């Protein structure tokens, strides 16, 4: 109903019409009492309250249309006003019905637009920046407490970072292994794809030709990127943080190589069908840019910012190092004393419950710091250096009232890869059937990869994260779904996240210290997968 119609219906209310008539009669006679003025004021306020929801609804609809049109227009242009070749390719494929035989519908692909990260926008508000200042003040107090306690215990200032030095030990091995991983990812996938693309249209058996090259690419993904970093990590007995660097880079490069091949195969197939003389291959520079760009979705071109703000880059890296020292002090002041004291009494339900609840605070702080250091500071630093325009690496996950929304907004970079290359491709492959199976596959893959990273980095298999993610996380995804909008559900999401991170920190830390205090002389494979916490009895 429009505002005009709404106003026209005001005459259907006899009480309001009578009040208006009495007021006008009194006004004409030149006599207006205070009582009549108050009645008129209440009448106007009531009408305004009735019109307010309708007015806001119409304004909201117009605003949504305006923003949608603006995004659609800006998506087709980069900052310099030049049309992005990827978008034009997508439009051509959308019009070409033959592309349906080659890949999932192209209109479902991710569209990159220039935008700031959400925290950069929020930090412009003084009230939000104050929360940031609170975390800095807390870090200062952690540092002061450590210095004071060390001075009281040792009688001198002890500025040692033994835990950091141990965690990032054997760093030269990390560097040369990373270079080998990077150079192989830069050369081998591009060479295989280029060789396949040039020979596909000329081959008398294109299917067999494609299967051979696909098998070679799979061997590279699993045999080279999948095996070599893991072997180096285990053979050289790297410490935990050094292991995390190599394993996370291993996973990132595998996902990058898959995206590059996945996005470019349809272009080669289209060119072969149309017998086009135009070379559909991207350049080495485009692939090299993609390997460093803070995204897992390949495009020939991305929105670019006009300049690089080197001061902004330095600030982001400074904040990363600040978060690193923050986590160090959390482990030093909150975690280490807790788990070192666990050995003073045998493992029991009481010890476990106390450990979980005492681990909630450090677990939540580590959650916030990990999110801020990597998803905001680290990715924004590389985005700024590469003039990468689309900075939406996360959304407002803290406002989530459902787990499905939390999974979509917590890590947009990884979510996009899983959504387009696992979920959407499975739906396309099975003709949009088995949606639940496709979602289950996404959860299973994510849970397995997370648990693989932790198992390799910690040198033991303790599937706490796998159980929480695969079973409880998936169940909450269906139970606490997008239909839950009330604030109480946001509280429930936060409470479950707090408890979950407390469980993860408690169980994995207990297992770590149990293996330190109860080592085995000749461990078998089963000893690596059997929890030591359940059988270890500390000797004093």
From Swiss-Prot:
The active site is at residue 450. It comes from the Eukaryota. An acyl-CoA binds at residues 405, 408, 411, 415, 423, 435, 446. A motif (FYXDWWN motif) lies at residues 393-399. The chain crosses the membrane at residues 129-150, 171-196, 209-234, 243-266, 310-342, 360-385, 434-458, 465-480, 487-518. Residues 1-20 are annotated as: Disordered. One of its GO terms (biological process) is cholesterol storage. Residues 151-170, 235-242, 343-359, 459-464, 519-540 are lumenal. Residues 1-128, 197-208, 267-309, 386-433, 481-486 are cytoplasmic. GO terms for cellular component: endoplasmic reticulum membrane; membrane. The modification Phosphoserine is found at residue 2. GO terms for molecular function: cholesterol binding; cholesterol O-acyltransferase activity; fatty-acyl-CoA binding; sterol O-acyltransferase activity. It catalyses: a sterol + a long-chain fatty acyl-CoA = a long-chain 3-hydroxysterol ester + CoA; cholesterol + an acyl-CoA = a cholesterol ester + CoA; cholesterol + (9Z)-octadecenoyl-CoA = cholesteryl (9Z-octadecenoate) + CoA; cholesterol + hexadecanoyl-CoA = cholesteryl hexadecanoate + CoA. May form homo- or heterodimers. Interacts with UBIAD1. Each protomer consists of 9 transmembrane segments, which enclose a cytosolic tunnel and a transmembrane tunnel that converge at the predicted catalytic site: acyl-CoA enters the active site through the cytosolic tunnel, whereas cholesterol enters from the side through the transmembrane tunnel. Catalyzes the formation of fatty acid-cholesterol esters, which are less soluble in membranes than cholesterol. Plays a role in lipoprotein assembly and dietary cholesterol absorption. Preferentially utilizes oleoyl-CoA ((9Z)-octadecenoyl-CoA) as a substrate: shows a higher activity towards an acyl-CoA substrate with a double bond at the delta-9 position (9Z) than towards saturated acyl-CoA or an unsaturated acyl-CoA with a double bond at the delta-7 (7Z) or delta-11 (11Z) positions. This is Sterol O-acyltransferase 1. It comes from Mus musculus (Mouse). The lineage of its organism: Eukaryota, Metazoa, Chordata, Craniata, Vertebrata.
